[in-house]
Amino acid sequence: MMEGLDDGPDFLSEEDRGLKAINVDLQSDAALQVDISDALSERDKVKFTVHTKSSLPNFKQNEFSVVRQHEEFIWLHDSFVENEDYAGYIIPPAPPRPDFDASREKLQKLGEGEGSMTKEEFTKMKQELEAEYLAIFKKTVAMHEVFLCRVAAHPILRRDLNFHVFLEYNQDLSVRGKNKKEKLEDFFKNMVKSADGVIVSGVKDVDDFFEHERTFLLEYHNRVKDASAKSDRMTRSHKSAADDYNRIGSSLYALGTQDSTDICKFFLKVSELFDKTRKIEARVSADEDLKLSDLLKYYLRESQAAKDLLYRRSRSLVDYENANKALDKARAKNKDVLQAETSQQLCCQKFEKISESAKQELIDFKTRRVAAFRKNLVELAELELKHAKGNLQLLQNCLAVLNGDT
């Protein structure tokens, strides 16, 4: 038998591929620690057990857990977005909706085609699809945990009453998903926001820092979007290669078991090479997905949240400029001057408040994303080297065995 890499546990069930796989370099704070300690999938729903440890006086207990569903996470996110007090902050992006349809469909098709496979082929494919389902499930849990950790780490958002209710209230929050009418309303709101964004984007910013950030984030968001799509194609290519190795290895194994001749022994040894190479290629795909693709997807959403912050500030700037014009007109006509002055002062205060917090938010965003990308890219490079050395070792061992038999 060939001496290759230690097969060990499957790459999707390794401990370090769990809930902490998606890294955004969060700053932890012992005063408030939130994690998802457990999760249960029930048909189309996932129930998350949110575990909290806190020494803050706002909570009745120091440690407690509640069960939450995806819709309740969305409710919490939307409550931040809709709160005018948080207009000057980057709202952590909402976690994506759990989607296991593709994995379930693959498992169903596998069951339907069981009769056309050998028992070994069916068992191997079933294990791989179940591992794929588990990986998606873990990733879903991780995305929801990252959202809560980002909120818990934020000095302002962590004080929010709705966040405390989400963490501590041990009953159902009675939150439902949006119906068709509400989704249509959201669609029109986004249309209006897009049109308004075009108007707002044409306004020259009075602060060079924000003008630079607006230009940079627009380019950055587009580049991350493009990189995310290409990263997905790359991981799919590695996964396809692993699937091809599996099919080639299975065919060679079938040929090798037909007889006990030297050529059949050769087929069996090469079949083993393809099987072990398949595992490495699958690990490469999984590592690239976790360390790069997921990170790009997260920062694609967070860069959009940063763009939304700049939109709110620009909108406030336009309102402030319009209030100044209205005040000038009121003074010229000597009519409703007090009302115009009050409106102008409120717009000025709002704009200055948003600008003050937004500047620090954007600086923190840069620090956070640079640290996250540096950490993940270094780890990915180390894993790629490890897998490349593993592949080389497998090929050398295989050649040594085959040459020794000839």
From Swiss-Prot:
It holds the Pfam family Vps5. In vitro phosphorylated by PIM1; not affecting PIM1-dependent nuclear translocation. GO terms for biological process: cellular response to amyloid-beta; cellular response to epidermal growth factor stimulus; intracellular protein transport; negative regulation of DNA-templated transcription; negative regulation of epidermal growth factor-activated receptor activity; negative regulation of neuron apoptotic process; negative regulation of transforming growth factor beta receptor signaling pathway; regulation of macroautophagy. CDD domains: BAR_SNX6, PX_SNX6. One of its GO terms (molecular function) is dynactin binding. GO terms for cellular component: cytoplasm; cytosol; early endosome membrane; endosome; glutamatergic synapse; lysosome; nucleus; postsynaptic early endosome. Belongs to the sorting nexin family. This is Sorting nexin-6. It comes from Homo sapiens. The gene is SNX6.
